[in-house]
Amino acid sequence: MTALGARKVQVPGNLKYAAAPLPASDTDLHDLARMIGDRPVWAAVSTHQGEEEIVAAAHTDLVQKIPDVLTIIVPRHPIRGEDITNRLQSTGHITARRAAGQAIDSDTGLYIVDTVGELGLIYRLAKVAFIGGSLVPHGGQNLLEAAKLDCAIVHGPSMTNFTAIVAEMRHAAAIEEILDSKELASAIATLLRNDDLRSRRLKAAAQVAMKKDSILDNVIAELAPFLDSAAPRADVSAPPARCHAQS
């Protein structure tokens, strides 16, 4: 903006901090929680092509440590759900697919949530989340959403879309970076089994996510004087408009 001639430029911060926690249907939350039962749950959210196989490999390793673990996969593009399911089934995984109305049972290892608008539901059920788009060269996805719903965060090395947020989270010891399926499985297993560590991470991430939640108010306060001066003024000398009844 300064290069374009602006004399005074302010950067209030990322407006994603101001977003409310993602919503979830109480009915869906109850129904899905009933299907899951007391199984330990983690989720790989907003995954991109190439990441589902990494997540599935991590799940295979996890089962050796936590036999009843349930892995939820939420692809960034739900249209890929059927293809993801077919590919994972072809390698021997037992799956259930939400868009197809398939229920979770005791044999289900991978639950594919290929629907729109249910990320808030999944964050409320999972204890740990891997943030997708970070084990492929995409730049990551929004990790504040997980932080605001008490979900411990693990991510890959590609988080360039959220550099500042990641730096703050890392400084607060709120997140963990992994490089491959082995490290992913190890991180998830540790967080699922270590309540104290997970609680510390959750608290640290929530503090980072919430300390700037007034950022939108600050932006509006800065813009208000300009909006007031730019607003058209009514001509008080003009007669009021008449309303004509229609028959």
PLM feature segments, named:
Residues 1-247:
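Nucleotide-activated sugar donor-binding and catalytic core shared by glycosyltransferases
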